[in-house]
Amino acid sequence: MEGQSRSGSAKSGTRTGLGPLPGTHGALQTGTPSKKVNSSFQLPAKNTGPTPSEPRLALAPVGPRAAVSPPSERPRLALSSPRPILAPLSTAGEQKRPPPHRSSKPAPTSVGQLVVSAAAGPKPPPVASVSILAPKSLGQLVISASAMPRPTPAPLGPILSPTSRDQKQLSPTSVGPKPALATSGLSLALASQEQPPQSPSSPSPVPSPVLSPSQESHLAPATVTSTPASERQLPARQKDTAVRRPIPPADGCLHTPVQAAGLATSPPRAQTSSDPRLSPSFRARPEAPRHSPEDPVLPPPPQTLPLDVSSGLPESGTRSPGLLSPTFRPGIPSNQTVPPPLPKPPRSPSRSPSRSPNRSPCVPPAPEVALPRPVTQGAGPGKCPSPNLQTQESPVATATSPTSSWSAQPTCKSDPGFRITVVTWNVGTAMPPDDVTSLLHLGGGHDSDGADMIAIGLQEVNSMINKRLKDALFTDQWSELFMDALGPFNFVLVSTVRMQGVILLLFAKYYHLPFLRDVQTDCTRTGLGGYWGNKGGVSVRLAAFGHMLCFLNCHLPAHMDKAEQRKDNFQTILSLQQFQGPGAHGILDHDLVFWFGDLNFRIESYDLHFVKFAIDSNQLHQLWEKDQLNMAKNTWPILKGFQEGPLNFAPTFKFDVGTNKYDTSAKKRKPAWTDRILWKVKAPSGGPSPSGRESHRLQVTQHSYRSHMEYTVSDHKPVAARFLLQFAFRDDVPLVRLEVADEWARPEQAVVRYRVETVFARSSWDWIGLYRVGFRHCKDYVAYVWAKHEEVDGNIYQVTFSEESLPKGHGDFILGYYSHHHSILIGVTEPFQISLPTSESASSSTDSSGTSSEGEDDSTLELLAPKSRSPSPGKSKRHRSRSPGLARFPSLALRPSSRERRGGSRSPSPQSRQLPRVAPDRGHSSGSRGSSEEGPSGPPGPWAFPPAVPRSLGLLPALRLETVDPGGGGSWGPDQEAPDPNSLSPSPQGRLGLEDGGLGP
């Protein structure tokens, strides 16, 4: 073989990454001749020391340079070069010269694959004979491990490794002696002379190399180009369990395994995972640490509604921050993932909800089942779960860079989400029905079946003069209805706004209140050129867990030909409604906008008979394309980004009142989908996230979108939609944490300690309210105390409720910290018990237990204006009562209720709370009190009112109101201790209560 040529024909060439192609003269072609050896094609020298492993064959260079140590052979092989794998190397003793012509020896004509087979039995003594085997198949060299002399070490050259997996390994008896390619500087030799004999039935496979991530990056181009060769031939299956070459499925092709020199006798430089799904370049993410040394591979967790489709697999090492439950305590270990259920508040020690579980150490969910939603959060899928929430098989793991998931905050991929129900209903000036449970999807009473937040938009509420007068003084009957229905389900009225007949109510579970901030309302009139509020829009915006949400309830112009006017009105509403604060100024600046109401879009082109036929035959899809709103989505730029669920329910307008029949009057209005619910998620505009991808702050999934045909009080049918929100992060740290004892059995135990965060801006008008479980709004308190700022220990403060203000008897209560700046409860406790003994005077008006336990009639007298019952100076001047339940009054004559006579717990300002128990000497209020403050000696008689009260609606003489002083200290007339038919006070305690406090907020 000395005369063998080293130069191949220029016509044959090579294939990139497949090794040299066979030439016509039996020599291996190497492509373009090179006079200089490329060091990148060198691998570390083979260690020929003894090893207990199986005998393996390796392709080693011949020459004196074979003894060079591995560190001197840097850099290692990189297949990114277009040069062939087998490059001729010069020996140390000769000069580099152009390769001469090769001799005409028989050569393989295949892709250049060399199969190295192990010998059977012990190795015979080395002999000097060397034979060349003619190709048995198409250009294939079959090399046997027969006796042969070990050649002199040569400079290190590349080792040929099979690039496919389908080739069958030949039996050792069917192969001939092994050739030695001396001229080309290559030699085939045993990997180890001292290896023990091996049975012919267990040939030693050639393991694949273990490459570093930097070398694997160089292998990528060769991998792609080597696919055709790998599809034709495959070597025997590798059986080395210690080191296996994984094949990531995402690559779409097979990597070319390159056998490193000395691999059989030296340990690998990098150890890959035993899981074949993971590539050597796989690195665990920083936020998903390994929990067990026996489980180095990340378990595939269930993938429930992935937040970002462009990201990789959900991290199993991070625990999703679920919604904060009132039963969560700071002392509970982090491995408790499901708080106890709370259909009714448990009788347990009260603690303020601390920071979310996502702040605690990560707990990976079970890989075989989806992470269950805590039953106390009220956001379970209920009876109609989304298909996206079912347990899924996670895809096969692929090579993922450490920066594939940004970790500014953990992504809530397995978070059960925040559930919102939106309801719109044009009530047509009708009286409210008796029950709205099915409309609100309350789910049969279980807390987990309901929503976390409910937005209710009403249109055409009765706004006649007399009705508006009553609603100005007291809460309208529709608001009363929804508060009564939602109160037992732990819902609290967060905010409400009304513009004539358009009303928007926003409710939330009470334990979400500390994370709802920056609540603002606005309204825009569009009727009569903007001077009348029969048409227009009202909105409530707030920040929920750090995400800006906006709810917009609109009533747009009616009739078929007013589509352009509806567009103009919607643009006017969007442009005029502006909010304060850094979060979002305009409506479309919010992260999520819900737009709903009686939008009055009609069905064009089709006549009445065709529309009714499509409805009766359940062919609603024929009407979709002619719906004005659907057509406007494609043409109006103002509607860009708004989404709506499929209209799989019949048109909701117009019906005969009291029936489910469409309009049969003389007008015969054509049915239409006038009542709609749409939403829009703000497109990311802050640039890419730290991972290089666009960061999606939240994802919205609509679970249901339907009408409710069972309600027939109006000519419209109500429409409800349920949504699931998944947040990319949660701002779930309460600004104030309250702590109380397990039970208040004695008055001296009514001590409340609270801790204030440093970022919280306190006010001297902040107060702490005591609420019964099931309270309906933030002003529906039983008693309150001013939030003092005397420190007890560091940033811990303490307040005490007076014995007179505490309710008597037994019951479950909740404490809440009301912020004057935020106008909402920013801290709540768990339900706790109050068990105080009753006395003979428990029925007096100074005792709040009597008024609270007699029934909830007095609760309907609560003033529901946003600032009416807040004990702050600016709020006490507003006496526009929004108390629900006007029908519970015997007449329009206002009389002091027992709650108004209760005294200290209803004081609207600190000045009134500091009044002595004797009547203060105030000239402007003495006339209204009369002289009956002297006690029983005063002559009995009716109350003394001012002769004329122009600003107290003097047009209605039957409505008797008093003049209220600017300081909020105005009070009702004197009460008599002796029974008197004209006196409204049943006992002298009522007089003391009035002297102590004045009118309640």
From Swiss-Prot:
Record's function text: Inositol 5-phosphatase, which converts inositol 1,4,5-trisphosphate to inositol 1,4-bisphosphate. Also converts phosphatidylinositol 4,5-bisphosphate to phosphatidylinositol 4-phosphate and inositol 1,3,4,5-tetrakisphosphate to inositol 1,3,4-trisphosphate in vitro. May be involved in modulation of the function of inositol and phosphatidylinositol polyphosphate-binding proteins that are present at membranes ruffles.
First-tier enzyme category under EC: hydrolase
Comment block on domains: The 5 Arg-Ser-Xaa-Ser-Xaa-Xaa (RSXSXX) motifs may constitute binding sites for the 14-3-3 protein.
Enzyme Commission code(s) on record: 3.1.3.36, 3.1.3.56
PANTHER family, alphabetized: INOSITOL 5-PHOSPHATASE, PHOSPHATIDYLINOSITOL 4,5-BISPHOSPHATE 5-PHOSPHATASE A
Motif residue range(s): RSXSXX motif 5: 906-911
PTM notes: Phosphorylated on Ser/Thr residues.
Asymmetric dimethylarginine modified-residue sites: R56, R76, R83
Residues with the Omega-N-methylarginine modification: R56, R65, R83
Region of interest called Catalytic, as start-end residue ranges on this chain: 420-723
Tissue: Expressed in heart, brain, kidney, stomach, small intestine and lung. Not expressed in spleen, thymus, skeletal muscle, testis and skin.
Entry GO terms, CC: cytoplasm; dendritic shaft; growth cone; neuron projection; plasma membrane; ruffle; ruffle membrane
Annotated Basic and acidic residues bias: 284-294
Keywords: Cytoplasm, Hydrolase, Methylation, Phosphoprotein, Repeat, SH3-binding
tRNA processing in keyword set: no
Protein name, entry field: Phosphatidylinositol 4,5-bisphosphate 5-phosphatase A
Phosphoserine sites (modified residues): S171, S292, S325, S898, S985
Composition-biased stretches (Pro residues): 197-210, 338-348, 937-949
Ranges spanned by the short sequence motif RSXSXX motif 2, renumbered to the chain: 351-356
Domain of life: Eukaryota
Primary localisation category: cytoplasm
Motif position, RSXSXX motif 3: 869-874
Short motif SH3-binding, span: 346-351
Biological process annotations from GO: negative regulation of microtubule polymerization; negative regulation of neuron projection development; phosphatidylinositol dephosphorylation
